[in-house]
Every structure is written in C-alpha cells, then in structure tokens.
Design a protein with these regions (language model features):
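Flexible, polar/acidic helix-loop-strand segments at domain edges
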Residues: 1
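Polybasic, lysine-rich low-complexity intrinsically disordered segments
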Residues: 5-16, 31
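Feature captures the catalytic ectodomains and active-site-proximal regions of enzymes
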Residues: 10, 18, 37-485
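Enriched - but not universal
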Residues: 30-31, 51
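Nucleic-acid 5′ end/cap handling module spanning
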Residues: 34
Length: 485
C-alpha cells in the first residue's frame, strides 16, 4: 500500500501534465491508488490517466436533435433543401460561432427508425442481436408493466379501404384521445387468444401511435418475428424503413427462426391483427367517426417486436457527465428511462420557448442536456417541403433565439444535429447524412456559416458515425476550452 504522502507526491507530479486537473479527478485518482504492487500501480495509473484525459466535469453543453431535419433538394423549394431554403438567422449565428460536419446516424444503407438512431446519436451502437427493439423502449416510455418474456410492439392506428388496402398509415395523424382510448379498451376486452390466459395491453400514446404488450403466462415469447407494418423490416430487432409502393396491405406476421416460441409468437400477433380489424370495423366509435367525416381507425400496424429489457450502461457513466433531457415522445421517454437520464418537464411538443428556457436553466444543475424536437420529421413524412421549411424557421425563431438569449456562450457549448434524414420527396426516413454543428465562443470557426447539408460536407469535423458524435464533440470542446473554464 502507498502512504498518503507518497500518493500526494505522485498526484503533484501528474498534475503538471494536466492543465484541467481538478478536485474531482483527485478523488477519482485516490480510488486507483489502492495499489498492491508497482505493476498494479502502473496499470491503475494508465486507467486513471485515460479518465483524466476524458474529464468532462468543466464542460457544459446543450445537445439538440432536430428529428428528421435532413433532406434532399426539392422542386417546391427551387431545388433547395428545407434547411437551405429556410431563413434561420439564429442557426446561422450558431454555425458561424463553431464548426460543422456531417453524420450517418446508424450506418450506410440503413434508413433507421428514431429509436435506434437516437441511441446511436447518444453514443450507443448495438450489434443487431443485442438490441431490445422499439416496442420495448416505447413500453418503458409509457409505463407499461413489462418483463422479460413478454412481447412489446410499436403500433400505428391506420385506415383501410373496403379491400383492406392501407389508405393512410397514420389515420389522419391527429386522433382524439377519447376515440383512441375507446378502441384500445374494446380490443383489450374482446380479443381472444388461442393460448389460455394470454393478456394484452393496448396503450395509445400521441396521435396515431400505439404501444402493444402481449403476455402469455406459460410461454416466453420471441422477438424473432416479422412486422405486420409493410413499411418497415425487422432486421435483428432494428426497424429499417423499406421502399414501398402505394397499394399496401397489412402483412402476415411470420417467424424469423424455425423454433417453437417464434412460431407461437407470430400466431398470437396474427390473431391480434385479424381480430382487431373485425372489432374495429364494427366499433360504434368508427360509426361515429364516419358520420363526422373522420378517417376510420381500421387496424393497428405492428412493428419492432422486443421481448427483453435493454442492458446498457447509464449515460452519465458512459460519458462521465451529468446528463438530463427534454423529450416528448414515448420512444425518447423510454430511452431516457433506460439510460437513467433525468427528464425535465417543458410543456408540449411545440412549446419551444419553454423548452429553451428549461434547457438553459438545467445548466445550473447538470453539465449536459439532450433536447429532442419532433417537428421537422412529420412534414418530411407528409411530403410537405414548404411546411418543413417553415417549421425550421419557427424552431429557429422560437427555440434557438430564446436559447441563445438565456445562456452564456462563452461557457455553454451547443451541439445541433438530427437523428436521421426524412426527405420530403421520399416521405420516409433515409440513410442520407445529416449536419452536425459544435458551437461556442471558444470553438474555432472553420469558415462555415450555415447549418445545411451542403455546408456540412465542407466542414472541418468531417463525416462521423452517429455513435461518435457525443465523444467527438467532447474531444473538440476539451481541446479548445480554456483550462478551469
């Protein structure tokens, strides 16, 4: 064992190498100094030095993901993208006060869903077999009782025509809570499964979104099944958007493995789909909606099955920071719960000023906050390039303007990116790169002046993978922030 006197001598020696040394690292180092031999000391010191070099305790950053903001040139915008066409004076100021690059959130050739994309953008990269599935993440996010062996799926209320062709995969998107809850209750009460005592929870969340949990008490259900939603493939638990046509039907759920529990699970999902279409068709709620000239809630398209709770390290441990978040949607709420992030209340989806003020205030108690703004993605899915441009302008005026008015940019860094692109011309997610900006008074500008897809290609950050963004941003900040800032 080393005496305290020897420890302090070593600390003083090492201190000369690290200008950003602080009391936090002294305590951390003391933990590594319980060495029993010189060899043990060398090994422990290497670990400690790596941690000192990654010390983020003096960094404050606000990390904003603009859902689906990336896009492609569009004829309605004279061949520009919504980011390029938008009037964004505050975003321009932020970009001019930093450096820019581009990001492929999950991987080349993968048009990701938001869940896996956000995990990657927060630094978590999964092998396909290790991912729990969006269904589980959303079940956690909405507070459904879930345990390993249950089956959780993400669902969409959708509209079918008389030939059961999908005419609107979101049933008009805006669905009254009374109608969504009423249909869900009918399904829970009326669906009868072939396996006795199998129970179902149907939980409507926001708009057209639904989370479904199936529990068969005598069976462990499998996540190795296909989606009934024809717009997405299940690739190792990860939802990947497919290129699809206009005449789509609810797909039959199939086992992805020739094993009993996958076959049993797919049968249960098909029983749910087939019975729910009949129940919903005859529902008094849909009769009322027809009289009101509203879109029918004809079926629930299911995707992204999961059967186990995710096993990942907390984000504070991963990045050596005290993280918090502002999120609205069930999937992001689930991610915050899984990663042990404190979630701040900050109004509704479009309460942009409130979100900005809460994010700025969070810098008093946390040194990082992740803010997820949903708006741009929905316009991308609707193919509305002008609407997407206007939404970006609204976010610039209401969120980013309020944010910069409430933070000290000499002390707080702003990182802005997206979870994926949602090109209006495709009406779906794509693997196209999205911009990333790292901005603060102490960050050297690389000559870029706007956060756009084209300028991102010229920025000094280069091309990153999504799982690298937080780490690379922190490296950039540490390399340029003043000691003891």
């Amino acid at each position: 064992m080393f005496t305290k006197k020897i420890k302090m001598k070593i600390i003083q020696k090492l201190k000369t190498y690290f200008s950003f040394y602080n009391n936090c690292t002294i305590q951390r180092f003391e933990n590594y100094m319980i060495a029993k031999s010189l060899q043990d000391l060398k090994q422990r010191s290497k670990v400690w030095i790596n941690r000192v070099q990654m010390d983020n305790s003096n960094i404050h950053m606000i990390y904003v993901l603009l859902d689906g903001v990336g896009d492609l040139p569009h004829p309605d915008l004279d061949g520009k993208t919504p980011l390029e066409a938008a009037n964004t004076p505050t975003l321009d100021k932020i970009a001019s006060n930093g450096t820019i690059g581009e990001v492929i959130s999950v991987g080349k050739g993968i048009a990701p869903e938001s869940d896996i994309a956000v995990f990657n953008m927060l630094g978590y990269k999964f092998d396909h077999a290790d991912y729990a599935g969006r269904g589980v993440i959303e079940a956690i996010g909405v507070g459904i009782d879930f345990k390993d062996g249950d089956l959780a799926l993400r669902g969409n209320y959708s509209t079918l025509d008389e030939n059961e062709v999908i005419t609107d995969r979101r049933a008009g998107r805006q669905i009254e809570k009374e109608d969504a809850d009423g249909i869900a209750k009918e399904l829970e009460e009326k669906i009868q499964f072939s396996i006795p005592d199998t129970k179902i929870v149907v939980a409507p969340t926001i708009g057209h979104r639904v989370t479904v949990r199936i529990r068969a008490p005598t069976k462990k259900l499998s996540s190795r099944i296909t989606n009934t939603d024809p717009a997405y493939s299940n690739i190792g638990g990860m939802g990947v958007a497919k290129a699809v046509g206009d005449f789509l039907k609810v797909e039959k759920c199939l086992p992805l493995e020739d094993v009993e529990n996958a076959k049993i699970t797919s049968n249960l999902v098909n029983e749910f789909s087939e019975q729910s279409i009949k129940i919903m068709k005859n529902s008094d709620i849909n009769k009322k909606r027809k009289e009101q000239n509203k879109k029918q809630l004809s079926c629930i398209l299911l995707r992204d099955a999961g059967n186990k709770y995710p096993d990942v390290p907390p984000i504070n441990e991963k990045h050596e920071m005290k993280f918090s978040c502002i999120v609205d949607m069930p999937v992001e709420l689930g991610i915050s719960e899984v990663l042990k992030m404190k979630a701040f209340e900050a109004g509704g989806l479009t309460d942009y000023e409130e979100k900005a003020k809460v994010a700025a205030k969070a810098m008093e108690t946390h040194n990082a906050i992740y803010v997820h703004l949903k708006g741009p993605d929905e316009f991308g899915h609707d193919g509305d390039a002008i609407g997407k441009m206007k939404n970006i302008e609204e976010i610039d005026q209401r969120f980013f303007k309020t944010l910069v008015e409430n933070i000290d940019s000499s002390n707080v860094a702003i990182i802005i990116s997206a979870d994926h692109s949602t090109p209006c011309i495709n009406k779906g997610h794509s693997d196209d790169p999205v911009p990333v900006v790292v901005s603060a008074d102490y960050i050297k500008n690389d000559g870029t002046t706007r956060m756009t897809e084209e300028q991102a290609k010229k920025g000094s950050i280069g091309l990153l993978q999504g799982a690298e963004v937080v780490t690379k941003s922190l490296e950039l900040i540490r390399s340029q922030i003043k000691p003891n800032h």
